[in-house]
Regions:
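Thiamine diphosphate
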Residues: 1-136, 164, 226-228, 253, 392-526, 536-537, ...
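Flexible, low-complexity linker and terminal segments
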Residues: 1-9, 133-357, 362-363, 503, ...
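Short beta-alpha connecting loops at secondary-structure transitions
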Residues: 46-47, 105-110, 126-131, 278, ...
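A glycine-rich helix N-cap at a beta->alpha junction
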Residues: 44-53, 94-105, 183-188, 446-459, ...
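Short acidic, glycine/serine/threonine-rich loops at helix termini
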Residues: 35-38, 61-63, 84-88, 110-117, ...
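Conserved thiamine diphosphate
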Residues: 107-156, 162, 198, 345, ...
Length: 597
């Protein structure tokens, strides 16, 4: 064994390798991205690593490998589980052979997600087990246990770290070396692996019986613990358990119960923990899952227990908890004097720093070109998930809607059908196009919609950490592969008008938008320019004495590198990348520098 200082996601990855991992597939999404990347950093024989085109594809790749007896890991953030839910629901009925663990990282807050959905609820819905680690150390061990339970009960298993567990750091003991599992291979059996209604009917009954067995098994699982004693009990899971433990470390006469396996609920374990208890506080983030389970249990066994939590208003219904929030909740519950907290009344307020597109980001130029071309015309601007969602910020104000990955393309079609006078735009990044955009384009062509697809191609998956995708020409196994051409895909689908333009050429970009806006049908503009974070900046721009202080550059493009200094427009050289967009909009040609050299 050796010590490694790793973040929670790294601990999950190393734990999976220690469990004999054979294959990992996933799709990047905060807070889960580093899991798969960590596996890729430790090259060894017998493990296939891939960023799949989306979460559904990742789930299906892993499923067939599991059918062959291999141990497989699937990684995603919680909203990715929605995308993967179709195969996952069926997998719960069909079952697996080799251990299969699906990491679905929840995001209380949310900090970087569309929703505050709870993977524990999804596990209940799918009727499969879920593990809920509290720390990176626990995550390292629990992911290994999850593989064992998966193989023992022939079921996929969910693993649910939250953002604070994923991104926490800890020094943990890990194995010196790993060995991938040796597996039998796929054994053909159509009565087992081909899903039919009759098989689903029989397996549904088996699943319910199996879950009772798993719940009983979880009752003796080492991570489900009871500490202390008393008539009052605090039930917690995940990071909330750490907050509770911190508050209660010197508090006598209270039980602290950790539920590390929320589903199937360890009923007998909890029933025993409730012996002698009259009041319960359920400390948990997102849904009142544990609270509901204890209420169900109290009703089933006619227990006279006061159960408190989210549904009684004691715990916030939304947002993440913290040590201070948990302390306040538990002090109220236990009638304790609230713990003293650091006085920050005299501390200066943190500066407001709203998220913005980077200085030199080509997406800013793409949005500005469309805005300039459509000035005075009724338009709809449908956004998508990625850095370019920040196009909604002032002064660009170029994202009217954002729902989920790929939705911008199909939502633009909906706007067309209810308002044929408007010009309907869909903005989608190159990675999102491959993940969930192509079917939307097929739908547009098939139904003869009138819309303009703007593919913001910056040659990476920027927002989640610059992961490769099918258009980059490389994969996570370190191989150079053929690039999938977005233009050829669009041509194959049947898009008749396709224009590729450098968004940093403002005149050409505006002309392309105007041309497409006057043509009926499905049109596509590929705004192609690399992400400024992965390319060498051109240099710095400068502002000459010709500047008339009209501030058009500040009012219209919102680049963070253009600032006011002593009341005058200036360039922040620490941020400027020399993209030259500002020089192209200056009415008096006062901005020069890198782009003109």
């Amino acid at each position: 064994m050796r010590k490694e200082y790793v973040m929670g996601n790294g601990a999950i990855a190393l734990g999976a390798l220690a469990a004999g991992l054979n294959l990992v597939a996933g799709y990047p999404g905060t807070p889960s991205s580093e899991i798969l990347e960590t596996v890729a950093k430790y090259p060894h024989d017998g493990v296939h690593v891939e960023w799949s085109v989306n979460e559904k594809a990742a789930m299906e790749v892993a499923a067939s490998a599991s059918y062959s007896g291999a141990r497989t890991l699937v990684t995603m953030k919680q909203v990715g589980l929605n995308v993967a839910s179709d195969p996952l629901m069926s997998l719960a009925y069909v079952g697996i052979k080799g251990g299969m663990v699906i990491v679905s990282a929840d995001d209380p807050g949310p900090i970087s997600s569309q929703t505050e959905q709870d993977t524990r609820m999804f596990a209940d819905f799918c009727r499969i087990p879920v593990f809920d680690p509290s720390t990176p150390e626990e995550a390292y061990q629990m992911i290994q246990d999850a593989f064992d339970y998966s193989e023992k009960y022939k079921t996929p298993v969910l693993f649910r770290p939250t953002t604070r567990v994923c991104h926490a750091y800890a020094s943990i003991e890990v194995k010196d070396e790993w060995k991938a599992k040796e597996y039998e291979g796929f054994v053909k059996d159509s009565k087992k692996w081909v899903i039919f209604p009759r098989l689903s009917f029989a397996n549904h009954a088996m699943i319910e019986k199996r879950n009772v067995e798993i719940g009983d098994d979880f009752g003796s699982y080492s991570m489900n613990t009871v500490e202390g004693s008393g008539s009052k009990a605090v039930f917690a899971s995940g990071i909330s358990y750490c907050y509770a433990k911190e508050t209660l470390k010197n508090v006598p006469d209270v039980k602290l119960v950790r539920i590390a396996t929320p589903h199937p609920f360890p009923e007998q374990f909890v029933k025993n923990a409730l012996d002698g208890v009259t009041e319960v506080m359920c400390l948990e983030e997102l849904s009142p899952y544990i609270e509901n389970q204890i209420l169900r249990l109290a009703g089933k066994y006619h227990m006279d227990i006061d159960v408190r939590g989210k549904q009684t208003g004691d715990v916030p219904a939304s947002g993440e908890l913290s040590t201070n929030k948990a302390a306040d909740i538990l002090c109220d519950f236990l009638d304790l004097k609230k713990t003293s907290q650091v006085d920050v009344s005299d501390a200066p307020e943190l500066p407001v720093r709203p998220p913005v597109l980077c200085a030199g980001c080509p997406h800013r130029a793409s949005f500005y070109a469309v805005k300039k071309a459509m000035a005075g015309r009724k338009s709809y601007f449908c956004g998508d998930i990625g850095c370019y969602t920040l196009g909604n910020a002032m002064p660009l104000d170029m994202v009217d809607t954002c729902l989920c990955m790929g939705a911008g393309i199909t939502m633009a079609q909906g706007f067309h059908w209810v308002d044929e006078d408007g010009v309907c735009f869909a903005f989608v990044g190159d990675s999102t196009f491959f993940a969930s955009g192509m079917t939307g384009v097929v739908n547009a062509v098939y139904n003869d919609a009138n819309m303009i697809l703007c593919v913001l191609d910056n040659s990476t998956t920027a927002m989640t950490g610059h992961q490769p995708h099918p258009g980059t020409g490389r994969n996570m196994m370190g191989q150079f592969v053929d690039k999938v051409s977005i233009q050829k895909v669009l041509e194959g689908i049947g898009v008749k008008k396709i224009v590729t333009v450098d968004p940093l050429d403002l005149e050409a970009s505006v002309a392309a938008v105007k041309e497409c806006a006057d043509i009926r049908g499905v049109k596509a503009i590929i705004f192609k320019s690399p992400c400024i974070a992965i390319t060498k900046p051109s240099g710095k721009m400068d502002i000459s004495e010709k500047c008339i202080q009209c501030k058009k550059c500040i009012r219209e493009i919102g680049c963070p590198a253009i600032i006011l200094k002593d009341g005058k427009v200036a360039i922040d050289e620490s941020l400027c990348t020399g993209c030259g967009l500002c020089a192209q909009i200056c009415p008096v040609g006062a901005i020069g520098g890198a782009c003109n050299e």
